[in-house]
Amino acid sequence: MLENLSTEHRNEKTMNLDEMSIKEVLQSMNEEDRTVALAVEKEIEQIEKVVQTVIKSFEEEGRLIYIGAGTSGRLGILDAVECPPTFGTDDKMVQGYIAGGLKAFTKAVEGAEDREELAEEDLKSIGLNEKDTVIGIAASGRTPYVIGGLKYAQSVGASTASISCNKNAEISKYAKLNVEVETGAEILTGSTRLKAGTAQKLVLNMISTASMIGVGKVYKNLMVDVQSTNEKLVERSKRIIMEATGASYEVAAEYYEKAERNVKAAIVMVLLQCEYGEALEKLKYAKGFVKKAL
């Protein structure tokens, strides 16, 4: 029942929210937000297991698929679309699906989250298989769309995980791994786009970033698979080469172009003083890990 969920409880500290000054409202929000990272910290071990599962999928050329409704679905899509420019992935490697389809990203689609079959249809449309990992996201932990998606994922042998903001969440029954970040009552009762949404974003950041590190998308703490899709990222790419090799801006820029704007290859070329083709071979042999290629 909805009233039993901690995310639906009234926050005792903000009973007079409508009477607070603007500054008091902001201070209350800030105070509550401080608790979110601590709540996430309690779930690190579970998040680690999820990351290990995602890495295994990636190593087997499987995909990471997020499913959710409302804010939860939007956060999954947000994390997914950041992976290609940040980590050089193709747009199929990490995907996000929201109840009601992409139009629901900007406008609520009434009743979509209550239909389990919609998630099954979404996952069937991409040929979900046993190599993939599906992560269901729901602050309440009871969204039918997410439950339907997790059920279907299990039926085809895909790995499954859930992210919710209540303990003993309903969706946890349908996923092998469960991340339950108990964020408690919101300052505005039931508005889970607040602390619960923040917690979900933090967890998704962890999962995608740690998984990409696990498949060689990072060298030291540098995003060496960054895609130079605009002038800012072109400059960042050159700076990454400089940081990784100690080369001057001019040398970094030269090798960046020699490597056909492949940052990883440019780093290997500078440090090993080799040609582009040899750098690519070394990276291929090292499965994309710069450190191993060196």
Swiss-Prot record:
One of its GO terms (molecular function) is carbon-oxygen lyase activity. It catalyses: N-acetyl-D-muramate 6-phosphate + H2O = N-acetyl-D-glucosamine 6-phosphate + (R)-lactate. Its EC number is 4.2.1.126. Signal peptide: none annotated. Pfam families: GKRP_SIS_N. The active site is at E82, E113. Pathway: Amino-sugar metabolism; N-acetylmuramate degradation. The keyword Lyase applies. InterPro entries: Etherase_MurQ, Glucokinase_regulatory_CS, MURQ/GCKR, SIS_dom, SIS_dom_sf. Residues 54-217 form the SIS domain. Keywords: Carbohydrate metabolism, Lyase. One of its GO terms (biological process) is amino sugar catabolic process. It comes from the Bacteria. Gene3D superfamilies: 1.10.8.1080, Glucose-6-phosphate isomerase like protein, domain 1 (3.40.50.10490). SUPFAM superfamilies: SIS domain. A lyase-type mechanism (elimination/hydration) is suggested for the cleavage of the lactyl ether bond of MurNAc 6-phosphate, with the formation of an alpha,beta-unsaturated aldehyde intermediate with (E)-stereochemistry, followed by the syn addition of water to give product. NCBIfam families: N-acetylmuramic acid 6-phosphate etherase, PRK05441.1, PRK12570.1. PANTHER family: GLUCOKINASE REGULATORY PROTEIN. Belongs to the GCKR-like family. MurNAc-6-P etherase subfamily. Specifically catalyzes the cleavage of the D-lactyl ether substituent of MurNAc 6-phosphate, producing GlcNAc 6-phosphate and D-lactate. Homodimer. This is N-acetylmuramic acid 6-phosphate etherase. It comes from Bacillus cereus (strain G9842).
